[in-house]
Structures are given as C-alpha cells and as structure tokens.
Regions:
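Secondary-structure boundary motif
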Residues: 2, 37, 69, 136-139, ...
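Short, basic, glycine/proline-bearing loop/turn elements
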Residues: 16, 46-48, 88, 92, ...
C-alpha cells in the first residue's frame, strides 16, 4: 500500500545552484522537458539564479519559457532582492518567494505580485517578524502560505511542520480561521491544486479534525475520505536501491588539505560570519598572519568543501566566525544544494578526522573532539537520507546535536543544518563552494 498523502514535486531548476560549484549532475532545460509530465510534477522548483533571471541568461530563460508555456507554477528564491531588480525578477514569470526575513521585504514582494511563503524551519525562523506586520496592518492574506524550507526530523517530531506555523500565528494574535487559510486553501490555490484545501461538495476529502482551534491537537486525519491511521497499517516497506549508496567519493585528501600553509601572512582574507537563527551571513576579514592566533582563541574556524561526487579533487578552503565549536570539527554531506562534503573545525587535524569518518560511513553527520570521533550519524542513502526507523533516527539526531552544543556550538546555530547552508552560493552574503569563497552579492569568487 501507499502512504495516505498527496505528494507533489517541483522540478529542480538549479542543479547545480550556480556554475560556481560542482554537483552530482546537471539539470538543464532538455532534462526538464523529459520530466515535466511525470505524475505529481506541479511546476518548477525555486529559481535561485537571480542574476541569470534579471540579466536574461539564455539557459535560465529556456527553463522559464518551458513552464510558462505549460501554465505551470514557478517557485522563486529572491533573498534581499528589492526595487527594480525585484520587478525584473517577477516580470520573468516567477510566482512565489520564501526568502523574506522581514515584513518590509515580504510586503514589497506581495505588492509586486508574488505569493509569499512565510518560512519557519530549523535554521531560518522568519514567521514572527512577517506575521506581526500582517496582523498589525490587517492585510488580505490570500497570497500568503506557510513553509518550512528545511526542517530537521527531530524538530518535526518535537514541533510539527505547518501545524506549528498555524499555532505560532494564532499565538501572535491572528484569527484561527485566517491562520488555517494559509495552511490549506491558500497553498492549494498558489500551486494550482483545484478542489483541494477546503471542506466543500466535490472537493477532495483531506481532513484534519481538532478538538479546538487553540491547541490544534489532531483528533483524526482523513485522506480522500479514508482514515489515514488505518491506511498507514497497510503500507508496504520499500528497500532503497543499492545504486543510491556509495556516493561519497572525494579525491584523496589528508591533513595538508586543510593546512594553514594555504594562507599567506601578508594577505587579507574574507571570513563568513554566521548569524544565529538565520541562514544569511555577514562578511568580515582577517589578515593571514592573525589566523593561527584567531583559531587558537576560537575567534575563527577553518571551513572546507570537498567535491564528493566525481573525485575531481576540488577543495574550497576558507574561514568562518560565529559557530562556537571548541577543540574539534563537525562535518556533513548534507550541504545545500550540491551536497558536497562540508567540514568546519578548530584545526586541520580535527577536520581531516571528521572528513575521513564521513568517507568511511559513506555520508552523514559527524562530530570530532580533538582528533577523536565523538559521534556519527550515518546517512547511507546518497549521503542525505537514512534507512533507519524515524524514531530511532530522531533519537540519534537529538543526541549528536546535543553533543555538538555541549562542545560549544552556539544557541541559535543548528550544528548541521546551519552549516549545510554555508555551501549555498545564492544566499547573501558570503558562502563557500568546492571552488572557493564566494561573494553572493557580487556573484563572484573572492580572489
């Protein structure tokens, strides 16, 4: 039996996210044409190549033209895009955006015709800032919906996903029925799902029954009129295909890969500065001669991205502030969106140990203290997913995250999700890919 839920996808528009990194494959317009009519495909996934849209890149335009010609929804990704650049971005045919971090930004996007997806995830928590403005100004909410963007399994278990967003909205003072609209019919209409998202004759009977509109504790769930809990009893387990394993294949590396010898004393180097509760970063700098002392004091960390799909040997090495880890390293093969191996540490030796551990287990999360592995959570499916039962995995996630925080990772920083976004070169202001440190505002590498 199948899961009692409706499952839809938007085809990834940016694989890789930019030409400034290396991913497992390349998704161009020709590939997308082959997949666009597959069951469950609604439209195009978030168009992260903002300069490519604004300045009319030929390949980007082919993708946009394809989905516009079919009348399909096109998801956007426009962090800090304002004014004339926002107008140009929206004019290309993009329908949604989920990157607003303030009410002022969200309001401008609504005025320009975008549907705004209000985000509350693990690393990015923007709902309160946006909905306070919505509530204070009493605006129409028909072009608003909720999203998580990225949420840890453990956070899903402890908080929920969209229900958590509804609860937060009500707690902020939004009328319960208005808040529920964002979670139901608004989302259905934004994505062109006809006769879904409301209780009405002839509409799909996907229902959640609550005992009240404050706590929103589900009493029963129905999918297409069928009790979802009973339907779950008939689910047939699926064994992951063997081809989805063994994907962590970086070229040979050792402790010298992460050595301070790569930094010249007389040069100034860019430093990524993490922000608690955000995936945006700030820029700072440090002189090469000061790096060793800053590492020792915990002011900066070494950070590296190792290409792990094709064994190219590409390694981007840089510096980061604001993580908090003491005497060790953290590494993960979940590194948006090309999912190379990203590692951060207080020493080359610790980073080498962490990266070697992830090659050994073929992907996942790992935490090192000194040069000894403290804990590892294997993600054996493409280095991204686990075949372990959900409850077991939640316990493992909680445990390794708690150990990372106990080793100094700051509150407001998710040890793994926050780190994973440091490799995504389409979110301001400074990132790192397997090709080096990247300024997303200038859309170029920092030499």
């Amino acid at each position: 039996g199948q899961m009692p839920l409706n499952y839809y996808v938007n085809l990834p528009s940016c694989v890789p996210a930019t030409r400034f990194e290396h991913s497992g494959c390349v998704m161009d317009a020709r590939n997308m044409i082959k997949l666009v009519n597959e069951p469950g495909v609604l439209g195009m996934g978030e168009m992260m190549n903002v300069p490519g849209v604004i300045y009319n890149s030929a390949e980007v335009q082919k993708k946009l033209d394809l989905f516009q010609s079919l009348g399909r929804v096109i998801d956007g990704h426009a962090p800090c895009v304002r004014g004339k650049e926002l107008a140009a971005y929206v004019a290309s045919g993009i329908d949604t955006d989920h990157e607003s971090i303030s009410w002022d930004e969200a309001k401008e996007k609504l005025r320009n015709g975008l549907a705004v997806l209000v985000r509350e995830g693990s690393a990015s928590r923007n709902l309160t800032a946006i909905l306070r403005g919505v509530i204070d100004e009493g605006i129409d909410v028909s072009s608003l919906a909720f999203c998580t963007d990225d949420k840890h399994l453990a956070d899903i278990r402890h908080e929920g996903t969209i229900r958590h967003c509804v609860q937060m909205a009500i707690a902020l003072g939004m009328e319960p029925v208005r808040a529920l609209r964002l979670a139901t019919i608004n989302a259905a209409r934004i994505y062109g799902l006809r006769r879904m998202g409301a209780v009405a004759p002839g509409w799909e009977a996907d229902l959640v029954v609550f005992d009240n509109l404050q706590s929103l504790i589900p009493q029963a769930v129905f999918h297409k009129g069928v009790d979802a809990l009973k339907a779950c009893e008939k689910i047939t387990p699926v064994t992951p295909n063997a081809s989805l394993q063994g994907s962590v294949k970086p070229a040979e590396f050792d402790v010298t890969t992460f050595s301070l010898s790569h930094f010249a004393d007389d040069r100034e180097y860019p430093v990524i500065t993490m922000l608690p509760g955000e995936i945006f970063t700030e820029k700072s700098t440090i002189m090469g001669k000061d790096i060793a002392a800053a590492l020792a004091s915990g002011d900066v960390y070494l950070i590296a991205v190792l290409e792990r799909h094709h064994g190219t040997g590409n390694v981007g090495l840089g510096l980061l502030r604001g993580y908090g880890l003491k005497d060790g390293a953290v590494a993960t093969t979940v590194a948006h969106d090309s999912h190379n191996l990203i590692v951060i540490g207080t020493s080359p030796e610790a980073m080498n140990a962490a990266a070697k551990e992830l090659v050994r287990v073929q992907g996942g999360y790992t935490l090192v203290k000194g040069t000894e592995v403290v804990d590892t959570l294997p993600l054996n499916i493409c280095g991204l997913m686990s075949s372990a039962p959900a409850e077991e995995l939640i316990g493992s996630l909680d445990e390794i995250a708690a150990k990372a925080h106990a080793q100094g990772v700051l509150d407001g920083i998710d040890p793994f999700i926050s780190l994973s976004f440091m490799a995504l070169p389409v979110i301001p202001k400074l990132r790192i890919t397997d090709m080096g440190m990247f300024d997303t505002e200038e859309f170029e590498f920092i030499k």
